[in-house]
């Protein structure tokens, strides 16, 4: 859930409108070779947003149980961001240690790729509204962009995950790939 969803008591309109798995605030689903994990990054989340919260314990266990080729965690508030809203440091959980391959967020109306703690974080809030300015780059910031709206495209196979951010004019601004680690022989 995002900050605007929580502006109504208990995020009720959002939760009434959408039918989502689990408790509907944080949940997971599998699509092809990717296991997606949604977490509620808002400070009003009843189960907490710190690395020791009930929600984090759920994520840690769910990631460790996943058998998909790729595990992607997504949320609204970014753990790392160089833009005007800045980083939500309480969301700097040990995602890589728990088994995540990629962390996606929004909130700041920018595109930024950050590499921290053995994992890639992407902030992509350029789907609409006006872009935000950048401030001081956070450690590990690889690329920052906020000139044109755009979208992120992710393609995954069992061995490779490719992410590409393109503007509405179809100009590719950033692209990166992740290779799945070799599985040990039985």
Predicted ranges, named:
Residues 54, 61, 81-82, 185:
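N-terminal active-site segment of His-dependent metallophosphoesterases
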Residues 66-82:
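Short acidic, glycine-rich surface-loop motifs adjacent to enzyme active sites
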Residues 1-70, 90-102, 110-157:
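Extended active-site neighborhood of metal-dependent phosphoesterases/phosphodiesterases
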Residues 143-186:
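A short C-terminal boundary segment appended to hydrolase-like catalytic domains
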Residues 82-88:
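Active-site His/acidic residue clusters
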Residues 41, 75-78, 107, 166:
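Short, well-ordered beta-to-alpha junction loops that form the rim of enzyme active sites
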């Amino acid at each position: 859930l995002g900050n605007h969803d929580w502006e109504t008591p208990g995020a009720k309109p959002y939760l009434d409108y959408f039918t989502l798995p689990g408790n509907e605030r944080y949940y997971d689903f599998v699509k092809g070779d990717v296991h997606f994990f949604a977490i509620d990054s808002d400070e009003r989340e009843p189960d907490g947003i710190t690395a020791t919260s009930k929600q984090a314990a759920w994520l840690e266990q769910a990631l460790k149980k996943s058998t998909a080729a790729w595990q992607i965690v997504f949320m609204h508030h970014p753990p790392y961001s160089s833009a005007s809203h800045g980083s939500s440091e309480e969301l700097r959980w040990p995602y890589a240690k728990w088994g995540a391959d990629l962390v996606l967020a929004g909130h700041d109306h920018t595109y930024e790729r950050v590499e921290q703690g053995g994992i890639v974080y992407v902030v992509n809030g350029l789907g609409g509204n006006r872009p935000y300015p950048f401030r001081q780059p956070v450690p590990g910031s690889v690329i920052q962009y906020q000139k044109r709206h755009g979208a992120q495209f992710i393609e995954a196979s069992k061995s490779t995950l490719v992410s590409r951010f393109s503007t509405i004019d179809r100009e590719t601004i950033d692209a990166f790939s992740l290779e799945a680690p070799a599985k040990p022989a039985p």
